[in-house]
From Swiss-Prot:
It holds the Pfam family DBI_PRT. It comes from the Bacteria. One of its GO terms (biological process) is cobalamin biosynthetic process. Keywords: Cobalamin biosynthesis, Glycosyltransferase, Transferase. It comes from Ruegeria pomeroyi (strain ATCC 700808 / DSM 15171 / DSS-3) (Silicibacter pomeroyi). This is Nicotinate-nucleotide--dimethylbenzimidazole phosphoribosyltransferase. The gene is cobT.
Length: 336
C-alpha cells in the first residue's frame, strides 16, 4: 500500500523521486528477445513494448495477468459557458451506466480481461468556472489526486485510466494551452460535437481561462484549469509509477492529465505508453509534445478509457510472444 498524500509538496517530491525501471530485468529481456525464434526486429514495436514492460515489472520474462481499468467522473463549472453539446446531468447518468455494465468501456475492459472500477468525484459539486476563478482550491486538488492515488490496485500489473465528465475537453484544452503555448484554437476541438459557433465560444473560454491563470507550474495548471476527474487520473498515473505498474494512456483528456505530471517531473511518464491517437485534433500534437507514439489510431473520440482498454490486448500480445516463444536453442532451430 502507498502512503496517503498529505499535501501537494509531498506529491511533488514523490514525482521527483519516483522509481525507474529495473535495469537488470530490462537487460535480461533484451537478451532473451535476441534469442527468440524470429529474425531480429521481425515483431517490430511489439519487441520494444515487451522489453519496456519487463523493465518496469522487474521480470525479464513477465506475464500480464491482472490489468485494471479505472474510470473517474467529475463535473465542471465551466459548462455554464455553454462549451458542451450535452447537459451536466449526463455525467451522473453515465456513471450509473458504467456501474450497470452498459457502457462501451465495460465491454472493452471485459474483452481485455481487465478489472474495471468507477470513481465519481463529488458530481453534485462541480469545479468552479475557470474563466472566473481557479477550478479548485489546493485542498480540492489534493483530494482529487488522492482519489486517483488510492484507486490503483497494488496487485494490478497494467493500468488504464479513463474519464467521464461533460465539458471536460475544455479544461483539457486549457491545460495543454497553458503548458505548451500556441493559440487557444490550436488545442480546442469540437469535443462531443459542438457546431462552429460552439467551437468559437469554446476557444474563447479556453483563451480567457489561460489568460486569467498565469502560472505554468504543472500542479497549479491542474488546480486552476483542470477538473477533479482529470486530477484523479494524474494521481492514479503517479501512483502506478510508485508501484512500477505500466500505464496505457487513453485520449486527449487523459493525456492532458499526464502532461501536467510531466511539467512537474520530466521523467514522470516513462512508465506510460499512448494507447491511441483520438479524433480530437489536438491529441496528436499533445502526444508529439510528450514524445509518445500511439499504438492505435481508430478515430475514437469517446473517452472512458476506451482506446487505452483496446490497447491492453496489444501489450498482452507483445508480452505473450516475448515470454512464450521458444529460443532458437529450445526449438532446435538454427539461428544462422
Amino acid at each position: 500500500m502507498l502512503p496517503a498524500l498529505t499535501d501537494l509538496a509531498q506529491f511533488r517530491d514523490l514525482l521527483g523521486a519516483a522509481p525507474g525501471p529495473d535495469a537488470a530485468a530490462r537487460a535480461g529481456a533484451e537478451e532473451r528477445n535476441g534469442q527468440l525464434t524470429k529474425p531480429p526486429g521481425a515483431l517490430g514495436r511489439l519487441e520494444d513494448l515487451a522489453i519496456w514492460y519487463a523493465g518496469w515489472r522487474g521480470d525479464a520474462r513477465p506475464r500480464i495477468e491482472a490489468p485494471q481499468v479505472i474510470v473517474f467522473a467529475g463535473n465542471h463549472g465551466v459548462t455554464a459557458q455553454g462549451v458542451s453539446a450535452f447537459p451536466a446531468e449526463v455525467t451522473v447518468q453515465m456513471v450509473m451506466n458504467f456501474e450497470h455494465g452498459g457502457a462501451a468501456i465495460n465491454q472493452l475492459a471485459r474483452a481485455a480481461g481487465a478489472r474495471m472500477d468507477v470513481h465519481a468525484l463529488e458530481l453534485d459539486r462541480p469545479t468552479q468556472d475557470f474563466t472566473q476563478a481557479p477550478a479548485m482550491t489546493g485542498d480540492e486538488l489534493l483530494a482529487a489526486l488522492q482519489c486517483g492515488w488510492a484507486a490503483v490496485d497494488p496487485a494490478a500489473d497494467l493500468l488504464v485510466v479513463g474519464e467521464m465528465g461533460i465539458g471536460n475537453t475544455t479544461p483539457a484544452a486549457a491545460i495543454a494551452h497553458a503548458l505548451f503555448g500556441g493559440a487557444a484554437g490550436d488545442w480546442t476541438g469540437r469535443g462531443t460535437g459542438v457546431d462552429d459557433a460552439g467551437l468559437a465560444n469554446k476557444t474563447r473560454v479556453v483563451a480567457e481561462g489561460v489568460a486569467l491563470h498565469t502560472s505554468r507550474d504543472g500542479l497549479e495548471v491542474l488546480r486552476c484549469l483542470g477538473g477533479r476527474e482529470i486530477a484523479a487520473m494524474a494521481g492514479a498515473i503517479a501512483a502506478a509509477r510508485q508501484l512500477r505498474i505500466p500505464v496505457i494512456l487513453d485520449g486527449f483528456i487523459c493525456t492532458a492529465a499526464a502532461a501536467a505530471l510531466a511539467a512537474v517531473a520530466a521523467n514522470a511518464l516513462d512508465h506510460t505508453v499512448a494507447g491511441h491517437q483520438s479524433a480530437e485534433g489536438a491529441h496528436a500534437v499533445l502526444l508529439a509534445k510528450l514524445g509518445k507514439a500511439p499504438l492505435l489510431s481508430l478515430g475514437l473520440r469517446l473517452g472512458e478509457g476506451s482506446g487505452g482498454a483496446l490497447a491492453i490486448n496489444i501489450l498482452k500480445s507483445a508480452v505473450a510472444c516475448h515470454s512464450g516463444m521458444a529460443t532458437f536453442a529450445e526449438a532446435g532451430v538454427s539461428d544462422g
